[in-house]
Design a protein with these regions (language model features):
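Clamp-loader machinery-focused feature within the broader ASCE/P-loop NTPase space
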Residues: 1-126, 133-136
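Charged, glycine-rich active-site and insertion segments that engage polyanionic ligands
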Residues: 1-54, 68-71, 140-142, 149-297, ...
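Structural recognition of the conserved hydrophobic beta-strand(s) that form the central parallel beta-sheet
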Residues: 115-118, 131, 142-148
Length: 375
């Protein structure tokens, strides 16, 4: 007999107030039609959004084990729509139009629908204005969850139409302890997982994914090899990294294709097109998330190199690759490690601006190679 699954809301143990508030809202039938989750990166806003979506769509308030809950947990439920900005300057009008066209359509599997809008501060006035009426009076059974860093950088007209939920900043130690409790793994490894994945919930998922851990290993090896690498080696490493990052997407794509096949006979052509567009967005978002996770692996590694240059006994995040950290520290100096960190930051900005992932990785690796040799 398979073990009972825990709901995503119950797993939000680093944001107890948020967890209890949302759990009570669902249990008492008082869930708002529009939420605005506010907090610093890494506070767990996106994890909470998926958790709330799971509870809202479940007929048992988020049991964690029914078909709907499992699909939401795997990010494959066709009635949960996740949006992230598709241009360097923010959300496109076409994205807003697509969302508004989808809102009146009936749900595909559940009795309700959820729209998660990440980095909502990047909703520009011309795109946000189109959302206002729908945010204020959405159809019954539709929930919006917007994610942002601060109400101060959001359009006031958006903030006023949402129920704001503040998230406190979670310390790395507390986050690592939460992951260790959930997985039973060594606290040092859990600390690394949180640093790379970005939050406790995603850290737990990272430690369960051999493919995501392999992508991290590939990034560490790529940087470790840069001192002696020629141009062909760098390009080959970048290509291998992209392949590793995309590896977890195969299962997602297969699941999406099965859902399309199951619904092909009774959905209209327009509804199928909406589902195909949603699947494409989901794959793009997952690829971007994987790239950012790989870049976080590079960032934490080079940060550890910089700390080691300043103090050989420094407390590093990547304890399992301390030998690599030592080799890189021996090959460069503080200026070189700092330049390498700047190269990673540039790559992260480029990915946020929708630069081609392989190009962003190639440029970063060449820049890190140059930085490491500046000694």
């Amino acid at each position: 007999m398979a073990p009972a699954q825990t709901s995503l809301l119950a797993k939000l143990d680093t944001q107890e107030r948020v967890r209890d508030f949302l759990t009570n809202a669902i249990a008492n039938g008082r869930a708002s039609h529009a939420y605005l989750f506010l907090g610093a990166p890494g506070a767990g806003k996106l994890d909470a959004a998926w958790a709330l979506a799971q509870a809202f769509l479940c007929e048992r308030d988020g049991c964690g084990s029914c078909d709907s809950c499992v699909r939401v947990a795997r990010h494959t439920h066709p009635d949960v729509h996740y949006y992230t900005p598709e241009s360097a300057t923010g959300y496109l009008i076409a994205q807003t139009r697509e969302l508004l066209d989808d809102v009146p359509l009936a749900p595909i599997r559940a009795k309700a629908k959820v729209y998660i809008i990440d980095r909502a501060e990047q909703l520009r006035a011309n795109t946000a204005n189109a959302l206002l009426k729908t945010l204020e009076e959405p159809p019954e059974g539709v929930m919006f969850i917007l994610l942002g860093t601060s109400a101060d950088v959001m359009l006031p007209t958006i903030v006023s139409r949402c129920q704001c939920v503040p998230f406190r900043l979670v310390s790395p130690v507390v986050a690592a302890q939460a992951v260790s409790r959930a997985t039973g793994q060594d606290p040092a490894r859990c600390r690394m997982a949180v640093a790379v994945a970005g939050s406790p919930t995603r850290g737990i998922e990272f430690l369960k994914s051999a493919e995501r851990q392999d992508a991290r290993r590939q990034m560490v090896r790529a940087i470790d090899s840069l001192i002696a690498a020629d141009e062909a080696d760098v390009l080959s490493r970048a290509k291998s990294l992209i392949v590793a990052v995309k590896a977890p997407l195969a299962e997602v794509k297969s699941t999406q294709e099965k859902v399309l096949e199951q619904n092909a006979d009774y959905l209209s052509r327009g509804a199928l097109k909406q589902l195909e567009d949603r699947n494409k967005r989901e794959l793009n978002a997952r690829e971007r998330s994987g790239i950012m996770e790989a870049l976080a692996s590079a960032r934490t590694l080079m940060r550890d190199v910089l700390l080691t240059l300043q103090d050989e006994a420094a407390d590093v995040v990547n304890e399992d690759v301390r030998d690599t950290i030592g080799r890189l520290a021996a090959a460069t100096n503080v200026a070189g490690a700092t330049q390498a960190l700047e190269a990673v930051a540039t790559a992260e900005r480029n990915i946020a601006r929708n630069v081609t992932p392989q190009l962003a990785i190639e440029v970063m690796l060449f820049d890190i190679r140059k930085a490491l040799k500046c000694r």
